Amino acid sequence: MAVFATQRLYIGGGYVDATSGETFDTLDPATGETLASVQQASAADVDRAVRSAKQGQREWAALTAMQRSRILRRAVDLLRERNDELAALETRDTGKPIAETLAVDIVTGADVIEYYAGLATAIEGQQIPLRPTSFVYTRREPLGVCAGIGAWNYPIQIACWKSAPALAAGNAMIFKPSEITPLSALKLAEIFTEAGVPAGVFNVVQGDGRVGAMLAAHPDIEKISFTGGVETGKKVMSMAGASSLKEVTMELGGKSPLLVFDDANLERAADIATSANFFSSGQVCTNGTRVFVQRGVLDRFEALVLERVKRIRVGKPTDAATNFGPLVSAAQLHKVLGYIESGKQEGARLVAGGKRLTEGHFAGGQYVEPTVFADCRDDMRIVREEIFGPVMSILVFDDEDEAIARANHTAYGLAAGVVTENLARAHRVIHRLEAGICWINTWGESPAEMPVGGYKQSGVGRENGITTLEHYTRIKSVQVELGPYQPVF
């Protein structure tokens, strides 16, 4: 029997039944227990959501920027008031440790909405003089109806990241969460409605990739913001362009390098590498999974990482002491185990982990040990391909130029990091790394103020930061003539 009632769609400010007649189950990754049956949206449901969004968007855009800002701030207050209950729901649906969801997922999502609520009143145009009797002014106008397609690793945070700039700029958003973690986006919809966001301005349509394709191809949607894998992102981008030349934002995969130089504080470097690989059980798109270590400090670094891996507390996500939970699904577990086996077969040396955990309370869950491979080569699958799990690959390098060249030798370009005590080297290397998000002597923080996104096949456009708000508007140019019109004929 499911823990929660059947989950419906959220359209027009309230819950409605899907017309498809289809449902799917969402499971607790820690136990395998069915959390809820979720209704699958049909094409008719997507059309209904679009009609609702168009109507709501007109009302929302007609408000002043200050009015929109106040409503979004009320939503922030509600998110923070309900942080603990939302974190508990997110833990059940994703398998993340409660210590993590309490401190990160809802907190950072609320921060982003608060950030854009503050920027809503700063949207402005320009005045451009042409001559004494004529000038141009520009207006930044909302796009209209936008769609967000979320990933399963940060369900409510991603919903906040995508909806905040869209709504602040006067748009409506139809959001499709991942079918693997579909619960918390509905709670965000409830909160937006309670805060005073007009009906239809934030709709949630549940379902698998068919629903994402419907959104990408819909002619009345002006923009798609997608978070997920590269291959799916390419399909979404193709459909978005072919249907109506939609604007797109793509936050895709990565195989990010972390460079540890021989002058680094190795204790700090080991802390950074461990966090960059095992936070959220390694299910983070920016993970620094390719750890390049300068030869002279390789053995010491490896020993320090092993010390830290031994301190990781794998356990029930609901236990406050746990800091490493299960993978999100059986499919993800088997994918990760397949990569671990590949690493062994290709000759990498297993330093730590590598096995599924099945004893005791791990029996029903999707648990795998934090895994570290050393003696890795650039041509190994575990080094080349995104695993999206707790698998660290340690590689050795001799000099700066070599490290940079190898770090950049990838189709991805999402994130990169450098650990060194040499300030000049830190900036010199970072400036040559082909990645959109970079860290020096730290890893992983993505505050609301910081634009995040990738180079190469890791994405298009950015999320967060001022620049993202601009991409949820379009510019209208208006020329005004104060003098007589000069006829051509």
Curated annotation (Swiss-Prot):
Cofactor dependence: K(+)
Pathway: Amine and polyamine biosynthesis; betaine biosynthesis via choline pathway; betaine from betaine aldehyde: step 1/1
Sites where the protein binds NAD(+): 150-152, 176-179, 229-232, 253, 285, 386
CDD domains per the UniProt record, alphabetical: ALDH_F9_TMBADH
Keyword Oxidoreductase found: yes
PROSITE patterns documented for this protein: ALDEHYDE_DEHYDR_CYS, ALDEHYDE_DEHYDR_GLU
Pfam families in the cross-refs: Aldedh
Annotated residues for binding of K(+) 2: 245, 456, 459
Residues at which K(+) 1 binds: 26, 93, 180
Record keywords: Metal-binding, NAD, NADP, Oxidation, Oxidoreductase, Potassium
Record's cofactor remark: Binds 2 potassium ions per subunit.
Residue(s) carrying Cysteine sulfenic acid (-SOH): 285
Annotated EC: 1.2.1.8
Lineage top rank: taxon: Bacteria
Active site residues of this protein: 162, 251, 285, 463
Family indicated by similarity: Belongs to the aldehyde dehydrogenase family.
Quaternary structure (record): Dimer of dimers.
Function: Involved in the biosynthesis of the osmoprotectant glycine betaine. Catalyzes the irreversible oxidation of betaine aldehyde to the corresponding acid.
Name under which the protein is recorded: Betaine aldehyde dehydrogenase
Gene for this chain: betB
